[in-house]
């Protein structure tokens, strides 16, 4: 596949509207994504829209990668002109890597309980740069009792966990986790290692580190061969060492969650929605222009969640925004001004290039 040249990408100084990127998955979902985008339902097993993705599915050469309007892969475009896309400070810290993956995720059924390794574990056992800390910003819930499950309620010893997984005792695994009711607007940080699942009917924006690494603790009813696909190729004896088996008390668990309106204001109409501990992995802002909101230059992914409006940059005409739009904003687009009637969006950002954020 021919890569774009630097000249092809150097002219990118304005936001780009992105279409859906729906790799097939093993669990059901996708209808909420189609409704959100006002598009036909593509399939009942496309529950994830990988937005502005520089990442492939685990074990795949290209599946999962996003294409830009006109055809080039985002990964190739960024490699050709990293400072245009990411900004000099980001490139100094992370290289030509966005350090971010964003998804729309529609749980058409409860996901199997699983977890993701951290950076150190991934480097040691897989030779990869990124583990997978993630977060969820809840857009909608399909049931009145919508919930996620995460974190063991009590310490679980290695032998007990290994036995549950070997026997595929789904009831014991799920029953050992905290059940956390959720509603639209909630934001939850999911640290690497913590076992978790998203309940049926929950529709989220997922921000995560740019990897597709999962250790499956449960697969019995999901059409997966866990003995072959569930352990990242290292075997379960090693894979289960990435699991956080500690007990999560109520106060510790509550530190991972922010309800709508409980975030940190970073400017007029802009609210940081995740706990501060998320900033070293990614940042998420809820933007509601009143009547406008100004955003500093940064590589970012915009998910328009309500209303309509415009996005202005220093180059070219204003872009119209409507609910369901997803846009990629290069760093070179500069400062952005948002205006609109009932406009609301989630702005997804990579880790701050200077380390600890000052917000």
Predicted stretch roles:
Residues 165-216:
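Loop-centered beta-sheet repeat module
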């Amino acid at each position: 596949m021919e890569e774009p040249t630097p000249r092809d990408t150097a002219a990118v100084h304005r936001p780009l509207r992105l279409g859906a990127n729906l790799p097939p998955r093993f669990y059901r979902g996708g209808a909420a994504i189609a409704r959100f985008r006002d598009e036909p339902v593509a399939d009942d097993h496309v529950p994830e829209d990988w937005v502005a993705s520089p990442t492939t599915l685990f074990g795949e050469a290209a599946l999962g990668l996003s294409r830009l309007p006109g055809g080039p892969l985002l990964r190739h475009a960024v490699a050709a002109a990293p400072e245009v896309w990411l900004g000099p400070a980001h490139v100094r810290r992370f290289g030509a890597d966005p350090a971010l993956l964003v998804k729309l995720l529609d749980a058409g059924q409860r996901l199997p309980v699983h977890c993701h390794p951290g950076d150190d574990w991934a480097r040691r056992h897989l030779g990869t740069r990124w583990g997978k800390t993630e977060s969820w910003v809840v857009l909608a819930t399909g049931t009145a009792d919508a919930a996620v499950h995460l974190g063991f309620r009590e310490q679980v010893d290695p032998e007990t966990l290994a036995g549950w997984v070997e026997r595929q005792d789904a009831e014991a695994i799920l029953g050992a986790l905290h059940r956390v009711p959720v509603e639209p607007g909630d934001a939850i940080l999911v640290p690497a290692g913590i076992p978790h699942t998203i309940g049926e009917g929950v529709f989220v924006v997922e921000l995560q580190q740019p990897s597709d690494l999962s250790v499956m603790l449960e697969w019995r009813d999901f059409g997966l061969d866990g003995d072959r696909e569930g352990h990242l190729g290292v075997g379960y004896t090693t894979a289960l060492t990435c699991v956080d088996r500690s007990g999560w008390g109520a106060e510790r668990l509550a530190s991972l969650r922010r309800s709508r309106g409980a975030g940190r204001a970073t400017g007029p109409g802009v609210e940081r929605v995740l706990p501060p501990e998320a900033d070293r992995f990614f940042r998420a802002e809820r933007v509601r222009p009143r009547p406008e909101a100004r955003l500093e230059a940064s590589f970012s992914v915009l998910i328009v969640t309500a209303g309509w409006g415009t996005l202005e940059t220093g180059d070219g005409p204003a872009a119209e925004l409507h609910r369901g739009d997803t846009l990629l904003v290069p760093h070179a687009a500069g400062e952005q001004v948002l205006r609109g009637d009932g406009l609301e969006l989630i702005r997804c950002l990579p880790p701050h290039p200077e380390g600890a954020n000052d917000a």
